[in-house]
Amino acid sequence: MSSIKIECVLPENCQCGESPVWEEASNSLLFVDIPAKKVCRWDSLTKQVQRVTVDAPVSSVALHRSGDYVATIGTKFCALNWKEQSAVVLATVDNDKKNNRFNDGKVDPAGRYFAGTMAEETAPAVLERHQGALYSLFPDHHVKKYFDQVDISNGLDWSLDHKIFYYIDSLSYSVDAFDYDLQTGQISNRRSVYKLEKEEQIPDGMCIDAEGKLWVACYNGGRVIRLDPVTGKRLHTVKLPVDKTTSCCFGGKNYSEMYVTCARDGMDPEGLLRQPEAGGIFKITGLGVKGIAPYSYAG
């Protein structure tokens, strides 16, 4: 990994950029800006950005088998029609918690849309604790609730053999694993596979590479780290020129590039002067490892 190159490919100034997803069909990167209520699509060939504004904070976006997208908006799972710039509600969660919203979400290998909730923050990572839960939206639009008492539901992905579900509840400062049943979507036997060190700060978004290793974006840590979930060891750290790194995914040709989102929420003018690319989209090349294609929602 000696020839790593990091560049800000899009100075988007996201308040809180999140949920990067590569769309191979259009050579584009999808991502959201949560408080700005925007879903964005950056064309890597033309460098143009299209944006769709929705009516509530949008925390994740994913591919839909129809060629359109699904997204978590407020506390709703929604189908997103890009051409019409409209969202249709598929299901709603946390009806009894008016201060909650969805956070990170991702589609599993069977086409279910997993996403978790959290209380709305009063400042970055400051919120009423234990208010969130983890859910999945099945292809028939029914919702399964896995567990509650979540602080900040965050990064998630699945092992290459589809037998393990990896999950982050940010304020536990841990990357956890569950046994995962592909057929039923059931998860069980929760355990920690990595505890973050102090300088790594808060674990946020996560993705898996083609070797089965996990990459975790560290909020306030200004880095992505590569972990071996079997040994529990950190294998590599890539530092970025911004502190508030939020999530990561692989994309580009053969999924050989990594894209990283970040935030500028809560930064003072001095901090923004020091980190003018905060809120931008970063591309990392030369990692020497590839990712895998994202799954599409099957509903």
UniProtKB/Swiss-Prot annotation:
Cofactor note: Binds 1 divalent metal cation per subunit. Most active with Zn(2+) and Mn(2+) ions. The physiological cofactor is most likely Ca(2+) or Mg(2+).
Annotated GO MF terms: calcium ion binding; enzyme regulator activity; gluconolactonase activity; zinc ion binding
Binding site for a divalent metal cation: 18, 154, 204
Database matches in InterPro entries: 6-blade_b-propeller_TolB-like, Regucalcin, SGL, SMP-30
Keywords in alphabetical order: Calcium, Cytoplasm, Hydrolase, Metal-binding
Pfam families from the UniProt entry: SGL
EC numbers, comma separated: 3.1.1.17
Gene3D superfamilies noted in UniProt: TolB, C-terminal domain
Domain of life (superkingdom): Eukaryota
Essential cofactor(s): Zn(2+); Mn(2+); Ca(2+); Mg(2+)
Catalytic machinery residues: 204
GO biological process annotation, one example: L-ascorbic acid biosynthetic process
List of residues that carry N6-succinyllysine: 144, 244, 253
PANTHER family in UniProt: REGUCALCIN
Functional note: Gluconolactonase with low activity towards other sugar lactones, including gulonolactone and galactonolactone. Can also hydrolyze diisopropyl phosphorofluoridate and phenylacetate (in vitro). Calcium-binding protein. Modulates Ca(2+) signaling, and Ca(2+)-dependent cellular processes and enzyme activities.
Protein name: Regucalcin
Species of origin: Pongo abelii
